[in-house]
């Protein structure tokens, strides 16, 4: 039923807003001009103004065989090897955003290096996509859908360091953070209300108290 509704919406969108389909030979150019580096079949359908999935997949297969596009995951395609791996990580399972150790390490909260990309999503899973290991960490739906402390950069959703700090404590009761000096504690307590979790509130107050006592 959901698939039928999606196909109906796609046909409606195309017929209403995308009557001017690209001319033959311009299909690849349209993808290459897009700001996206990773495409789903649905993305391509909208860009091409094409509602027939068979036509889309056949055309994509032709470009892949010719070496003009790269298939990075089932149903996901990239312009070339220089695609944004974080964009890919958030396109495999949605909704999702980059967070946890990926953000904590980049922001100097944790010093340990991780090769995995850590992503908050609706399931726990570790996969490998085109050589990149990606760890998905399950979050409660109400938390996952709340965008407080989430920034969008080049089409990719990223947790702020304060959100990543709270997310990690939300799923891991005890955790060692190397450097809490970089956190904005006003933002931490602002985002904390998203979780509606008494255990987390007590834990954060404990970390804050210990932080203050060491200053």
Predicted features, each with a name:
Residues 1-18, 213-215:
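Intrinsically disordered, low-complexity and often Lys/Arg-enriched segments
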Residues 12, 78-215:
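Nucleic-acid-binding surface
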Residues 10-95:
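Short beta-edge/loop segments at beta->alpha junctions of small alpha/beta modules
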């Amino acid at each position: 039923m959901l698939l039928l509704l999606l196909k109906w919406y796609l046909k409606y969108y195309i017929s209403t807003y995308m009557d001017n389909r690209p001319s033959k030979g311009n299909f690849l150019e349209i993808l290459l001009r897009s700001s996206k580096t990773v495409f789903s079949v649905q993305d391509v359908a909208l860009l091409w103004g094409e509602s027939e999935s068979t036509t889309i997949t056949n055309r994509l297969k032709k470009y892949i065989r010719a070496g003009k596009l790269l298939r990075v995951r089932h149903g996901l395609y990239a312009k070339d090897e220089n695609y944004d791996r974080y964009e890919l990580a958030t396109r495999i399972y949605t909704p999702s955003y980059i967070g946890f150790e990926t953000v904590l390490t980049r922001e100097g909260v944790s010093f340990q290096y991780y090769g995995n990309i850590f992503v908050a999503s609706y399931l726990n899973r570790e996969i490998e996509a085109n050589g990149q290991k990606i760890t998905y960490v399950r979050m409660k739906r109400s938390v996952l859908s709340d965008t407080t402390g989430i920034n969008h950069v080049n089409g990719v959703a990223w947790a702020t360091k304060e959100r990543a700090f709270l997310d990690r404590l939300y799923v891991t009761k005890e955790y060692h953070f190397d450097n809490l000096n970089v956190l904005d504690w006003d933002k931490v307590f602002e985002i904390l209300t998203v979780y509606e979790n008494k255990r987390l509130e007590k834990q954060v107050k404990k970390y804050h108290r210990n932080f203050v006592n060491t200053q």
